[in-house]
Amino acid sequence: PVPKSQLVAEFREARAMLYRGDLNETFCLAVGEAQASGVPAVVGDLGSVVERVRDGETGTIARDDDTFAAAAVALLTDDALWRRQHEAALKARRAWGWPEAAAAFESLIP
């Protein structure tokens, strides 16, 4: 664990969040925090992380190792791609706040 101030500073410097995924992952706060900070994510097609990333918009959902590696390299080397996905991640964060979360939860209750 690191202090929140350090985590924020690390995300400000990050080009990409790389996470292979875990079959038992039910939320993946780390990817959520990265995306909320505007860091595009490259994730494996496994567990709940596929619900956090808008494939091709806020990051990449990689279906295999070659795609995962290529997407990571692309974010590190293609400034225009990084900028688009960075801005999309920030926009997605602003569109989902407590009122939206509460409404989504309430919609599940009959």
PLM regions: where:
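Short alpha-helical segment that forms part of, or immediately flanks, the ligand-binding pocket
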Residues: 8, 31-36, 50-51
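Short glycine/acidic-rich beta->alpha loop that forms part of the nucleotide-sugar donor binding site
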Residues: 25-28, 35, 45-46
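Short hydrophobic beta-strand element within catalytic cores of glycosyltransferases
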Residues: 40-43
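Conserved active-site histidine-acidic residue motif and adjacent donor-binding/catalytic loop
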Residues: 1-11
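Acidic donor-binding loop of glycosyltransferase active sites
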Residues: 12-26
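Conserved acidic donor-binding segment of nucleotide-sugar-dependent glycosyltransferases
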Residues: 55-66, 74-79
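A charged, aromatic-enriched C-terminal amphipathic alpha-helix characteristic of glycosyltransferases
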Residues: 79-109
